[in-house]
Amino acid sequence: MITLNNIGMKYNLGVERDNSFKQTFINVLSGKHRKNKKKKEDNFFWALKGVNFHIDKGEVVGLIGSNGAGKSTLLKVVSGVMKPTEGSVQVNGQISPMIELGAGFDMDLTARENIYLNGAVLGYSKELLDEKFDEIVEFSELRDFLDVPVKNFSSGMTAKLAFSIATIVDPEILIVDEILSVGDIKFQEKSKNKMMEMIKGGTTVLYVSHALDSIRDLCTKVVWLEHGVVQEIGDTNEVCDHYYKSQMG
């Protein structure tokens, strides 16, 4: 269902990034703008290098590794948010990504408005969102905050809203980055149970977490990534044990 072939992602640290018209304008006024910037090709690093693995339909794959290992970058590549420097990704199925809190939200809009905005981003019709609106609100536990701008939400509240919208229908492929570790314990457990329901229904899951207990509970196999390179792929308990020993080492 998901196949990664020799994925590499290179970041050039020697290039100034003028990502917006506003920043370019500021740079011109300050004299920092140079038309002919030279790339420092020797000043780069590989966030991912030579990553190969396959995920079958219905598998729940955990992605573990230290901070900066390249896990979030890999999720963005699989989701199509980022294009790899080298290699290719084949995905057969519709992806529902939960990789950044607030991605797909307009923080100035209310929770009510963002249900429709984020739902549209995920490909849901207005008719479906109308039908599922009360279900989303009930699951998110945010009924009293429907008309509050999301910019005033805590990270936990934002996570609740994002998860509740993304899971109103069972996606073919669910990509989750640490979202189950955000929010109160009650919601974490409720989210975990919801994921278990989707897994039983055949949803394919790629799941990043530093919580090895959660990885052990949910995942059928694990990919251990370190410094952008796959260290091990295999049985959940074996790979988690090896990773834990390396960290305690």
Task: Name the predicted role of every residue range.
Residues 64-66:
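The feature captures the beta-strand-to-loop junction immediately N-terminal to the Walker
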Residues 3-46, 237-241, 245-248:
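Pre-NBD coupling/linker segments of ABC/ABC-like ATPases
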Residues 227-228, 243:
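Conserved ABC ATPase "signature" C-loop
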Residues 23-33, 116, 128-145:
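Conserved ABC ATPase "signature" region
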Residues 233-234:
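ABC ATPase "signature
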Residues 215-217:
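A short, surface-exposed alpha-helical micro-motif characterized by mixed small hydrophobic
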Residues 209-210:
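H-loop/switch region of ABC-family ATPase nucleotide-binding domains
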